[in-house]
């Protein structure tokens, strides 16, 4: 069977082709009775608008690019952060009658392909996730004129509008909690130094300790469980007498719990542990993990609204966080 055309719908509804075009493209200038007749003809004939032709009329593709600057193996690992953000973004876009186009550039060639794709008019906006260091992509995408919003504060000098959680404040609350529990030799497992979440959570840790005159002790991780275990082992070697650790992610905190068990340290009797994120697994570690809850879904929903609104407001949106106290402290 041949695909029904605009002309066929117009003939069935008894109106012009231009009127049908306005109705199917969402124009509000058509008489309600005529609109009803056109929509009835569309349903009876099974007419489906041509996406390419429709985008020429509306100047919109109906798609939003979700650019994740991580290798696919990391995005689809056991880190629940990525799955929750991607799921929330897709659901929010579906509610707005949009779809997500997932892109994961992990090389300069991949970044160039993303830039060409966006500059070619294939998406109506871009959401950037998990930016690292002096990533050239934000500046390149901003030059295309397409609305661009970042999930998290960009570290690069190119600063698209962004939404984030209060990483500095959350780290402060975590370390202050450990001090209030009587802990005196508090170490940290920080995130990557080329990511704002890593930098800001380390800054919050150092701010609280500097106010007490205590020495800071840090080991660097990459937000994975394995890096948390390795960093914890290094911290115990550097300072066997430490009595608390603030890990900048829950996955690194679970790695720290594993390393502490292997070293024969009791949690929280010998070493108290605090994480950051409040992933579902934090309630089921042994012991259950004290952590800083960040509103991952709320941040993701806000970013979608920002990009759909055209990213006109450059004022950052920062969500508060909450300390969740469990048995690990």
Predicted regions and their residues:
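Alpha-helical recognition/docking segments in bacterial nutrient-uptake
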Residues: 1, 63-67, 71-176, 241
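N-terminal helix-turn-helix DNA-binding module of bacterial transcription factors
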Residues: 1-62
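Short gly/ser/thr-rich secondary-structure transition/capping motifs
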Residues: 44-50, 107-111, 257
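Glycine-rich phosphate-binding loop signature in dinucleotide/nucleotide-binding domains
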Residues: 45, 181-182, 235-241
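Short acidic capping loops at alpha-helix termini that bridge into adjacent secondary structure
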Residues: 184-186, 214-215, 267-272
């Amino acid at each position: 069977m041949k695909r029904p055309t605009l002309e066929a719908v117009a003939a069935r509804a008894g109106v012009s082709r231009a009127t049908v075009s306005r109705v199917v493209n969402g124009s509000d200038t058509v008489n309600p009775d005529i609109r009803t007749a056109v929509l009835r003809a569309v349903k009876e004939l099974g007419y489906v608008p041509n996406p390419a032709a429709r985008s020429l009329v509306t100047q919109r593709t109906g798609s939003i690019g979700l650019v994740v600057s991580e290798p696919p193996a990391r995005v689809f690992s056991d880190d629940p952060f990525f799955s929750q953000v991607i799921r929330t973004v897709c659901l929010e876009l579906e509610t707005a009658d949009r779809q997500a186009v997932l892109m994961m550039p992990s090389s300069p060639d991949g970044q160039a392909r993303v830039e060409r794709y966006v500059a070619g008019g294939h998406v109506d906006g871009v959401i950037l996730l998990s930016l690292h260091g002096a990533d050239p992509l934000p500046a390149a995408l901003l030059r295309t004129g397409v609305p661009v919003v970042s999930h998290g504060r960009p570290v690069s000098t190119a600063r698209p509008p962004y939404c984030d959680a209060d990483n500095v404040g959350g780290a402060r609350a975590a370390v202050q909690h450990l001090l209030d529990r009587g802990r005196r030799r508090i170490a940290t497992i920080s995130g990557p130094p080329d990511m704002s979440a890593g930098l800001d959570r380390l800054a919050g840790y150092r701010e609280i300790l500097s106010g007490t005159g205590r020495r800071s002790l840090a080991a660097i991780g990459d937000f994975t469980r394995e890096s948390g275990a390795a960093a914890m082992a290094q911290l115990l070697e550097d300072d066997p007498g430490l009595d608390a650790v603030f890990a900048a992610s829950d996955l690194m905190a679970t790695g720290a719990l594993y390393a502490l068990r292997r070293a024969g340290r009791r949690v929280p009797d010998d070493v108290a542990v605090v994480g950051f994120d409040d992933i579902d697994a934090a309630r089921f570690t042994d012991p259950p993990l004290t952590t800083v809850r960040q509103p991952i879904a709320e941040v993701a929903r806000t970013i979608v609204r920002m990009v759909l609104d055209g990213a006109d407001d450059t004022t950052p949106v920062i969500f508060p966080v909450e300390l969740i106290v469990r048995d690990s402290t």
